[in-house]
Each structure stands twice: as C-alpha cells, then as structure tokens.
C-alpha cells in the first residue's frame, strides 16, 4: 500500500506564531496550538499517515536569527510532542529569506523531492496542514490538498487557491474528525415531470445557505435549517408553480431528506437524538431520532390559509415527506398565537435538534444503538 503523508507546518500550526518578529527564539515564546496534543496524537495512533514537518525559518543561522536561539525552543517542542506520542518521520527546515527565492522555500518544492513522483507515496491522499496561503500553494504544487488553519478562505480565493483547500478551520478537533471520518457531504438531483431539484449539503459546515425554490417564505424557512443547524445547504428548485405549490414543497422535502440520510453515512459517533426551541409568543418543540424508522407526530394548528406564498396545509406534508426520506422519527408540537412565529419556530427547532443529533464524536466512534444497526 502506498504511503500517505501529512506535511505539517510548524509556526501557527503546531505552536502559536510569536507576534511582531514571528521568531520562536526563546523558551518563553513557546506556546502550543490549542488542542494539538490530543488530536495529533489521535491521528498518529489511529491513522497511517507519515508525519513530515515542513517549515520556513527566515534567516536561521544568521545574525538576525542565531541558531543558539532557535534550537532550545524547537527541541523542547519536539520533546513535548514526543511525550504525547507525536513524532515526525522527517523534519525539513528552509533557512532562506523570502527575497532569496530559494527552490527549497515553501511554497516551492525543493525540500520535498523525495516524495514527488515517488511510486511509494500517495500524494493525492496526502495533505498539507498550515495556516498560510503558501501552505495551500505547496499542496497545489505537490499534487495534494490542504487543511488550512484559518476560518476564512477569502485570501485563497484572491489567489485562486480555494479548490486546493479540503478544509478550513482553526480547530484541531475538526482536523482530526475530517482525517479520521471524512466530511459528511451529499448531493441529490431529483427530476420529475413536475420539478427539477438540486440539494447539496455539508453536515459539518458553517451554516452557509444558497436557497431558491420560487417561494420566498419557503426559502426563508429552509434557510433556518441551514443557519441554525450549522450545515452548509444549497437548494435549487424549478417547480410547476403555475399549477400550485404542492409539488415544489413536497419534492424539496423528499430531496432534502434523502440528502441528509446519504450524508449521515454509517451514523457512527453521532448523538442520534435532538430536541427543542421556544420563540417569542410561541413554544415550539421538535424531538427527533435518526433511528432508521420514519414516523411523524404532528401537533400544530394554523388558522391562516397561507403564510407568504406557502399554504399552511403543506407544513405537515413537508415534515412527513422529510421524515420519510431521511428515515427519522419526528415529534413536533407548537403553541402560540402568531402564525408566522409558530412555523418559523418549528423550522428553527428542527434545525437545533438536527445540530444536536448530528454532532459526531470520533473519540467514541460507535453506533448509538444496542441492536448494532440503525
């Protein structure tokens, strides 16, 4: 089997990069990145990646960065990591300055020649982990993808590097989860004589939504699911609204449910259960179970015929179709006077229940069922 590698940056990734001079040149400046020990130790013990440290240390060995100020902190860092089971198969340090344009300086690949075009290594299955766009560019240059330790990828978009970023996060918990269990993404295309629907989602996203169904109020409700569950959600619908709203709403629920079910995968490590949310004058309760047995209990009444362009009779139908397609048990109850608040509260409660139930723990990566199947 070919070897996979994690090419790991040092400053800003393993340790906090010192502000002002960006030099880790004293023991007082040594501060480890939050959660790095538990998660990198987990990756080292559970997965088959080689660990290679790849770092630029500007002017190391010159008067601006004497070696005697570098090695004590560096060696203590390595010793501390090793004490937690984190060792490196190779450590590559470039000492040049940016203006030198050295072939060995990241994002150039001169230090990595032993891994490039080497049949023993699976670079497509490898990752660069780092906090700078140059780390993502290095991933591009050696033919792998990057885990970018930043929240925003705006800088990557400016440089045309966003497609080489597999994950953007500042949380080592997410890094370990991604490498161990993968991202829970899915895409469903549902086409009938009445509708053409695309649903794409990432259960481990940031709540980014791009929704267009042709029904403004329905869009607003679906946005609550993405925003308040934390999933990235794209829904594009072309439906026969010239007939009525029924097919658009029903088929969207089916496609969304199928997409959630597909993205869930094995369900290992998930919480499985979730519940609840009050809103203004309303109390809306949603309890759910991803146990594989669809069922809907609905206790909510609406006096108006429509809210926005959405018939209130379709609310129950939406959640029944969603429950069936996602193979989840839903129990929904809403009390209150304001009809808009009531249904919006239900959608928000569903979202928060989803967030709770979909939470995944790789350190307890078991199926949440005594039967051994969900």
From Swiss-Prot:
Known catalytic reactions: D-erythro-1-(imidazol-4-yl)glycerol 3-phosphate = 3-(imidazol-4-yl)-2-oxopropyl phosphate + H2O; L-histidinol phosphate + H2O = L-histidinol + phosphate
Entry annotated with the keyword Translocase: no
Region of interest: Imidazoleglycerol-phosphate dehydratase: 184-374
SUPFAM superfamilies linked to this entry: HAD-like, Ribosomal protein S5 domain 2-like
Compartment(s) where it occurs, according to its Swiss-Prot or TrEMBL record: Cytoplasm
Keywords attached to this entry: Amino-acid biosynthesis, Cytoplasm, Histidine biosynthesis, Hydrolase, Lyase, Magnesium, Metal-binding, Multifunctional enzyme
EC number: 3.1.3.15, 4.2.1.19
GO molecular function: histidinol-phosphatase activity; imidazoleglycerol-phosphate dehydratase activity; metal ion binding
GO process annotations (BP): L-histidine biosynthetic process
One Pfam family recorded for the sequence: IGPD
Region of interest: Histidinol-phosphatase: 1-183
Cofactor(s) essential for the protein: Mg(2+)
Gene3D superfamilies: HAD superfamily/HAD-like, Imidazole glycerol phosphate dehydratase, domain 1
Coarse class of the protein's main subcellular location: cytoplasm
Protein name: Histidine biosynthesis bifunctional protein HisB
Organism: Bacteroides fragilis (strain ATCC 25285 / DSM 2151 / CCUG 4856 / JCM 11019 / LMG 10263 / NCTC 9343 / Onslow / VPI 2553 / EN-2)
């Amino acid at each position: 089997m070919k070897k996979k590698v994690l090419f790991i940056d040092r400053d800003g990734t393993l340790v906090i990069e010192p502000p002002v001079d960006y030099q880790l040149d004293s023991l007082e400046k040594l501060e480890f990145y939050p959660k790095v020990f538990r998660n990198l130790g987990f990756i080292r013990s559970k997965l088959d990646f080689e660990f290679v440290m790849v770092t630029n240390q500007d002017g190391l060995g010159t008067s601006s960065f004497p070696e005697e100020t570098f090695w004590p902190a560096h060696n203590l860092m390595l010793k501390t990591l090793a004490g937690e089971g984190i060792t490196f198969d190779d450590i590559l340090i470039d000492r040049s300055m940016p203006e030198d344009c050295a072939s060995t300086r990241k994002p150039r690949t001169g230090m990595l020649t032993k891994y490039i075009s080497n049949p023993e290594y699976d670079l497509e299955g490898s990752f660069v982990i780092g906090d700078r766009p140059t780390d993502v560019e290095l991933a591009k240059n050696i033919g792998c993808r990057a885990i970018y330790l930043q929240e925003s990828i705006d800088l990557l978009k400016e440089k045309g590097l966003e497609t080489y970023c597999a994950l953007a996060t500042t949380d080592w918990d997410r890094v370990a989860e991604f490498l161990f269990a993968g991202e829970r993404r899915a895409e469903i295309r549902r086409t009938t004589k009445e509708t053409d629907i695309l649903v794409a989602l990432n259960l481990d996203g940031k709540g980014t939504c791009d929704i267009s169904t042709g029904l403004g109020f329905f869009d607003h409700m679906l946005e609550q699911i993405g925003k308040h569950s934390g999933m990235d959600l794209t829904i594009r619908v072309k439906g026969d609204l010239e007939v009525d709203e029924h097919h658009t709403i029903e088929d969207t629920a089916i496609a969304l449910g199928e997409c959630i079910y597909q993205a869930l995968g094995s369900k290992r490590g998930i919480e499985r259960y979730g519940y609840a949310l009050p809103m203004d004058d309303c109390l809306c309760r949603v309890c759910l179970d991803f146990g594989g047995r669809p069922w809907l209990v609905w206790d909510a009444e609406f006096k108006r015929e429509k809210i926005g362009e959405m018939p209130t009779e379709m609310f129950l139908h939406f959640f029944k179709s969603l429950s069936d397609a996602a193979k989840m048990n839903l129990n929904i109850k809403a009390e209150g006077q304001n009809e808009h608040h009531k249904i919006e509260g239900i959608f928000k409660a569903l979202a928060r229940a989803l967030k709770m139930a979909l939470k995944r723990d790789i350190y307890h990566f078991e199926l949440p069922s005594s039967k051994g199947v969900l």
